[in-house]
Amino acid sequence: MQEKIQRAQGCLLGQLVGDALDSLVEFLPPQMIHKKYPNGVRKLEDGGTWDTIPGQPKDDSEMALLLARYLVKTSTYNAKAMQNANLFWLNSQPFDCGVTIASALLGRKNPNSQANGALMRISPLGILGTNYPLATVENWAIQDAQLTHPNPVCLQANALMARAIAEAINQNTDAKTLFIKIKHWAQALAVDDLLLQAIEESEIAPPKDYITQQGWVIIAFHNMLWQLQHAWEQFMALRPFLNNG
């Protein structure tokens, strides 16, 4: 049980640390990042794009923490309650908020957007999912994405990610086995061809371009799968995104 708790803690801390490190370089061109951080972005510091303090969450992690607090309180998921919580967060005037999320929370969902905002906040639901059947976790993850990112690609990416997190924490699944399970789940769910392509390509290469369509859920999903299979430690998994702003 203690090891399971540690895996859950590592998942949430990984989200928060990665997001806080990214705040130092978000939207900067790769050349500027390399000049400023020749050895990579490794230390939590103040400053950056949003002049944050060391370790301060950005919008994605603020929403993830909001979700985490609700799940700790209730031990279940309720889409209406999270819609209200997300509106509370938006009305708190966060220093940043994605366009897709802001529009959706103000009643103007964009069904064409394939942005990664829903995927970026889903880790707490995967953690809670260790206590529930994977089908339940999947359904909750889809409901949560539907609040802000109703495009089918976003819904399906959320479902696969939440399943993977719950499975990895609950079963201590090794990377190779987890990838095979993700591939099987994707086929069983008949996910969009873009996701299937990302899964196939992730076996042999990382995303070709992190910049041109920055914020696209397919790039985030593809990179996650590549790092799952090939990164030998945590910083190596974060480096591609951090080096590309």
Feature annotation, model-predicted:
Residues 1-245:
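Structured, active/binding-site neighborhoods that engage oxygen-rich ligands
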